Amino acid sequence: IRWHNKRNEESNKGDKRDESGGRLLKSCLLCDKEFKRSEDFRELILLKTKEEWICKECKEKFEAISDVHCPKCFKDKEEKECKDCKYWSKKGNKVQHEALYRYNEAMKEYFKRYKFEGDRLLGTIFANDIKKAMKKYKSYTILTTPISHEKKEERGFNQVSTILDYGDIKYKNLFKKEDSL
């Protein structure tokens, strides 16, 4: 699925080869700096390539959640259930959330550009990470959260289903957003 947005009509627009004509140079979707796609020996043997969308420097700005985290909300560096989850549990609310990355300045900027500035191609950045994390939910039916007609018109896309589409993750649209009073 391709979509016209402020960036490229095609995801490979602007890609070129390095001086030797070998490795593919890409433009980072976040900073526009050119970078060489890394090559993995397994990729060469299996003839499968892993698409890279951002440079190493930008990727390093996103902080992965460590193995030490709240078991309910994935708040980083919490060895047991965090105080927020305890609070909500006491109120009768079940907290069960999984996160791959911390919400830091890089993630904040990413969401600003992706959701609010309509840069649909940024949905590619985390699609493979999400696909990998979703493998343990193979038997589940994934449902998307609907957005209002106005938001879809404004953005031009549903941000959740777009990431799922880029990750080739199957899902269903069973819900519809009703206009609120």
Sequence positions of predicted segments:
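Glycine-rich phosphate/pyrophosphate-handling loop used in enzymes and phosphotransfer proteins
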Residues: 1-181
